[in-house]
Structures are given as C-alpha cells and as structure tokens.
A protein has these predicted regions:
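A generic structural signal for alpha->beta connector loops
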Residues: 16, 53-55, 75-77, 102, ...
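Short alpha-helix boundary/capping motifs
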Residues: 1-2, 38-39, 63, 116-117
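Catalytic core of membrane glycerolipid acyltransferases/transacylases, capturing the structured
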Residues: 22-85, 141, 150
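Non-catalytic C-terminal accessory region of glycerolipid acyltransferases
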Residues: 3, 7, 11-14, 24, ...
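Short secondary-structure junctions
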Residues: 17-21
C-alpha cells in the first residue's frame, strides 16, 4: 500500500493537484466523483485515493480491460462493464458490497463525460440497496483540488437526496465546463 500511496502523492504533485478533507472511516461506500467531463477525472481520483491510502473500484467499459494495458487498468480497480448488452449493473454492484467487507466504489453521477440532461441514478440505487453511505469527491480544476466535503446516508427519497448531492458540486469547475450540467431529477 505504501508504494501505491507514494505513486498517488507523486502523481498529484507532478500535476499540481492536492487533496482536501479526511477519508471517512466507513469500510464500504459509494463515492460520487465529479464533475466528470474528461478521462483525466478518473486518473486524478485514482491518484487522490492512493494518497489517502484507499484502494477503490470503479466501473469502466469492458474494452478498457482488454489488450496490452488491460491488466494495468484492472489493477487500478476497474470493474469491466459490457455496455453492448443490458446488464443488471446495480444488482451486481449491490452483490459486490454483500460479498466484500471493504469496498469503495467510485461512480460519476453523470454516468458519462458528455453533457447530460439529468444525472444517472445508479449510484444512488447501489448505495440504497447495499445499505452504504455516499461520499462526495469533488474534482475542481480551477483550484486543482480533489476534496471530500461530506458523506450522506441516503434517505430513500431520491429527489431530496439528489438536491443535496448536487449542491456539493455546484461551485466546482470541470475540465470541460460546457459538459458539466447540474440538473434536476
């Protein structure tokens, strides 16, 4: 873990990034990481988690884990998702929480790097079904900071909780601001 920590620390320093906030004590959680408008967002999140000494998991398209770099991508925590067919991804992730005592799953709430009319609800349903909290990771390109401003135990009222979640991202500057849209449910 120490090599992982030093890798993350060095990578953040080289990029001029820093972390803010303490990692929560919870052993299982869903982490909403945003704004998500670039592949760099995932790289900075992985590096920040390494600096916090956390091994995280994240969902990525299956093709990322194939080919010569596939092993490295899986090593960083990628859970391959086959997007060519319908899968019960929410159910599979809930089952993963039931099977693993220590699981930190990072999910961009927008679900994509492109601008969206509404955020995806999968992160919320995974957390509710698994009975785990949602921690907010905010990546701000203006300040080059990955921060953890709060953790929310979902109430089951998606609309009310979504307003809380989105409030923590309102002041963040995305790498591509035109692709970051705070939307209603």
């Amino acid at each position: 873990m120490e090599i992982w920590h030093w890798f993350g620390t060095a990578f953040l320093a080289l990029g001029g990034w820093k972390i803010a906030g303490d990692w929560p004590d919870d052993r299982q959680m869903v982490v909403t990481a945003g704004p998500h408008t670039s592949n760099w967002d995932g790289i900075w999140m992985i590096a920040a988690a390494a600096k916090w000494r956390i091994r995280l998991r994240y969902m990525g398209k299956k093709s990322l884990t194939e080919g010569p770099l596939g092993g490295i991508v899986r090593w960083t925590g990628c859970v391959p998702i086959d997007r060519t067919k319908s899968n019960d991804v929410v159910g599979a992730m809930q089952a993963a929480f039931a099977a693993e005592a220590d699981l930190v799953l990072v999910v961009p709430p927008e679900g994509t790097r492109d601008a969206v009319k509404k955020w995806k609800s999968g992160f919320y349903h995974i957390a509710v079904g698994a009975g785990v909290p949602i921690t907010f990771a905010v990546m701000d390109y203006r300040t080059r900071t990955v921060s953890l401003p709060a953790t929310l135990w979902p109430s089951g009222d998606y609309a009310a909780d979504l307003a809380i979640v989105q409030g923590f991202y309102a002041g963040a500057t995305a790498k591509f601001p035109e692709n970051f849209v705070l939307t209603g449910e």
